[in-house]
Structure formats: C-alpha cells, structure tokens
Amino acid sequence: MGELSGIPLVLAHPRFLVVQKPAGLLSQPGLGAHQQDSLITRLQRECKGLRLVHRLDRDTSGLVVVARDQDSLRDLSALFAARRVQKLYLADVVGTVGKHQGCQDQPLARLERHPPRYGPHPDGKPCRTLWRQHARMPGLTRLWLRPLTG
C-alpha cells in the first residue's frame, strides 16, 4: 500500500490509518532527548493531526491504529477500552511448551523501573491471556497469544 515517513502503511481509512511499527522504535516519544524518535513523531512529519490510538512496546513489532482526528481518536479509544478490538500476538518462547494450548491467568505488576519490566506479582493487576502453539523449533516454541485483560 505504500509508506508514510518510511513506516509501512497497511490500511488507509478516512478516519484512521493502520501502520506496521518496526521492533526497536518507540510508539511515542520518551522523556529523554535520546528518546524523541518514535512512530508518531515520524508519522506526524507528513500528517500533523495524527494521534496514537494504542501503543506497542519498543521491542514489539506489529500493527498500530492511528486516528486522523480527535473525534476518531475518541471513538476508536472507546472500542479498545470496551475490549471490542481483539489483539493477537505471535511470540517466540525459549524452551518447549508441553501443552498445545492454555490460559495464563496471573496478576502482573512492574518489577523494575529502568528499563520497565513487568511480571507475575500477587499484588498486580489481573492479567488473563489465551495461548496456542503455532510451531516448535529446536529449543523454541512459537505461540499465538490473545490477551483478554491486562
């Protein structure tokens, strides 16, 4: 479909865009001067009014929805908040997962601040994720992950 500021454009709708965020790029600028390069700053070089509807972590690649205006941002954000948008991730896990599918249901909390790391913690927020094996390789299992909460 093309590119916008070097970012692959997957879908162009009158109210929003869907772009392919590469791994290693922030979704939005960070606090330090060295963290100003981001998906949204690159996109806004060509389209000033664009706004992120959601974010992906720096190390995560994938599709990101970007609203074209404030009204679209409000409407799309409401869909995400109501969990009307399904998220699906493909992840490589070190080791062999014994079962073919399952549900991970553990509360998560921030374990470290810099860099921010999250993990299971009894005082964390509820987090429930469905998973299913996609492929096995030596020492690695590829999983489909579908977060339901968290």
Map each language-model feature to its residues.
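RNA pseudouridine synthases
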Residues: 1-150
